[in-house]
Amino acid sequence: MSLLVRAALAAAVVCAFAALAPVAPAAAPVPPKAGQVVTFPFPAKAPVVVQLTGVGAARERLSALLKGALGNDAADVEKLIDDGLKQLLADRKLTAVPKDGRVYLAINDIAALFEGTPAVSLLVPVTTYKEFRDTFLTADEQKTFEAGKGVDEVKLSAFGNDHTVYMVDLKEYVALSPDKGTADLYTTKFTHASTTGMPSELAKSFVGSDLALFVNLDLINDTYGEQIKNFKMLIDFGIQQAQMGGVLPGIGKKQLDAMKGLLQGAFQALGDCHGLVVAAEFRPEGLNLRVQAQFAEDTTSVKVLKAETPGPLADLGKMPAGLAQYMGTKYGKSFVEAARGLNAEFAPADDDEKGNAAVEKLQAALVAAGPQGEVAGIGGAANTLTVAKYADAKKAAAALLGCYEAMSAGGKVQGTILKDAPKVTADAQKHAGFTFAEVKMEFDFEATVKDLPEGVKENTIAQLKRGVAERQSIWVGTDGKQVVQVVAKDWAAARAAVDDYFEAKKPVGEVEGFKVTRKQLPADASLLLMVEVGQTATSILDSLRMVQDAVPGFPKIGKAPELKGPPAFVGLAITLKGDTATANVFVPGAAIAAARKIVAGLLTNID
């Protein structure tokens, strides 16, 4: 067993107490109130810390989540968890561990993880040190206990092996570590970490979650800044070499430049960032996952963030029900420009200088038109509706149509190569106060995948056809306030989609599953994505079936069980506000139940 696994073993053993905790309603973790300080038992200089907010309490909240998601079937899942963790605990008792006490796993030195014994420590809340020793240690382990001057030593048994662990009595906590030097640290007068020493938003997320990881990037940047800089240079060099050697098929110069810009931005953000929290919350309605970063004042990243004004994106709920994905965005100018480069919605061939110059100018005009938010519903190759608001919608519509007109054969629209130049018919239709132009395109799937390995070409074409019709019609219209784009099989279908949205015919916002997930996400967001579970799961499984024929040894996937009942949605909300960037993913109980049903069915059908 590796030293790293051995170091984490104590955490697994103590957290297994959750399996033995009595199941009863438990209040969610409470984040610190303004002015209220939470002092932690680990050193302020610990670069990485994991927290479990009460092994017993977290277990109770997980039980409530499972019952809400699985109903009577939750008992079977809980029994599997309980049996496995009871076996891990063996003869140990954890009566000396308060069920609401916070447990911490601190990485005291990142470099030491890869050099000898890892400098990690597990901090467990206890009633008393003596009671913990007498109840947690087995009879055989107690015989190996050796008292020291502040640091005691014991051999813990797990998986048939003995592991030396050092223990320190911290009164309300006991510190355990496989490294003697780390244990010695807890006998000295060290500076304790606290919520006052953490960025305010990160402190709330860290303390207010059931399970959370905190990364102190201020400390990491100070300690490893030079190594991070060298790593960035290595990646830059690797991208350049890959492009020169043709290792990145299908990626044009503009996309490569955008990738480099993204890389530059990522490392800039890393250097500007105070810290990062990755957290999970067990809610009765489902599971919420959060990734949050907070940045230092007077940095490039904060200047960009403070220009953002997230909103409720309420218009997303007006999209017609029955589609697979719904997405709304509200970004400022800087983010719109960055996304434009990465998305490459319009990418003339690299040797089409005239087309590239025209698209560059027109996309700049699109940004200058003042985007104020966009919502979209996506249902397949010929079923997409997008509604975008602009300060100058007529200018935006003209720029968008100009981009289509600037494309020629060999260029890419939405990543797929055009067989011929798009055919644009101005003023093709008028409806509901909108004047629509019609854009007809024909794609060349074979040319799109020509640089890919032979084994994956056929499957990639099949994937493309799921999202893009080989012959596609798009209607682009404006009423002077907003710009509408509709991908449909014909004008009748396009007109119906427009009516469904503007007349609120069966809007997705009235679907119960949509409402449940939206309520659990932040009220304001810069990006909101809602994914319908049934259609998305079917699409993913179909994609995996395509892969199984191309990859030797890939499991043969049978037919998944049909998902019945009302639609459920998994939601993602990204919020850029002030000095903080936050991503929340909410998985409702209905989605968890659907996932269990699919997995259980597949396990009986995989060859």
Regions found by a protein language model. Give the residues of each.
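Short, surface-exposed beta-strand/loop micro-motifs that present aromatic residues
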Residues: V38, L105-L113, N161-K171, E374-V375, ...
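Long compositionally biased, domain-poor regions of proteins
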Residues: Y104-D109, K361-L385, K389, A393-A396, ...
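One face of beta-strands
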Residues: A46-V50, V103, V120-V124, V174-A175, ...
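Structural boundary/hinge residues at secondary-structure and domain interfaces
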Residues: A28-G160, L202-A279, N288-A382, K394-A426, ...
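Bacterial N-terminal signal peptides
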Residues: A8-A19
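A conserved glycine-rich beta-strand in the N-terminal activation segment of trypsin-fold
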Residues: F159-D236, G311, G467-I557
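N-terminal secretory signal peptides that target proteins for export/translocation
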Residues: M1-V5
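Signal peptide processing junction and immediate N-terminal pro/mature segment
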Residues: A19-P29
